[in-house]
Amino acid sequence: MSDLLDTIRDLAKPTDSKILMVVLDGVGGLPLETNGDTELAAAKTPNLDALAAQSQLGQVELVGAGITPGSGPGHLSLFGYDPLRYVVGRGALSAVGIGVKLGAGDVAVRGNFATLGEGRIVQDRRAGRPSDEKNAEIVGKLKAAIPDIDGTPVEIYTESEHRFVVVFRAGGGSPLGANLSDVDPQATGVQPMTAQAHDDASQKTAQLVNAFVQRAEAALKDETQVNGVLFRGYSDVPHFPSFDAAYQLKAACIASYPMRSEEHTSELQSP
């Protein structure tokens, strides 16, 4: 099966030219009620304006008309990969972005710390955006409480604010599937979802995820704000063509958020 990336690989030639690509993730907004401007339209942006005056401008439809992509497919599309063919879950992006190596059969998942009220109702999906220090403290509690689940090794990593990463290791056993539903309901005022496997290979993963959620809530029961966890974006090790080989470009990245650390992205790519 071929796609545009195969054609680009055939046509690309190395040159001395340089490209600066600026990605403002999350800057989009809806018109304000006061004057109809978005936040970006209302802002004073002399530096962006000066950069735009020296740039080639355009618009891109990242996935399809009317589809708002998540960070994974959105960034893949920006860098020329078909996000419908090359699927990378948020868990893998988060894990690799902080330098965590994934092995065959492992599953990584992106976690949010959350605030749960009476009846396990989600009050805040980001637990008030705790400090990185508080994040590390909570991760330490979870590491002590959940080193493994029924013999399956569990690794927990701090990321930033409310974000953390969990890796379920296959440990030489049967590969864990990553095809299961999210725990994060993407809304407040409701309970967290129960993970449901969508295929046989993911049955064990769903059991591990649901057990982790229960144990995490027990470990955090004395916390007033960071007392729950929400999961989304399960991913095993993805593979896609090398950016260098496809475009004949040597890429470097400066990122303010660990998920996009280019230092580690080669681990997601095929030779």
Task: Describe each model-derived feature in a short phrase.
Residues 17-30, 51, 218, 226-230, ...:
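Beta-strand elements within well-structured catalytic alpha/beta cores of enzymes
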Residues 207-263:
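Acidic, glycine-rich loop-and-beta core segments that form the ion-binding/anion-interacting portion
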Residues 41-44, 159, 209, 256:
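Active-site-proximal structural scaffolding
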Residues 2-16, 28-143:
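Active-site nucleophile/metal-coordination loop of metallo-enzymes that catalyze phosphate/sulfate
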Residues 60-65, 154-161, 231-232:
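Acidic carboxylate-rich catalytic motifs and surrounding loops in phosphoryl-/glycosyl-chemistry enzymes
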Residues 263-271:
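Residue-level detector of conserved catalytic or cofactor/ligand-binding positions
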Residues 12, 27, 52-55, 142-150, ...:
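Structural signal for hydrophobic packing residues in well-ordered secondary-structure cores
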Residues 90-215:
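A contiguous, mid-domain pocket- or channel-lining segment that forms the substrate-recognition surface
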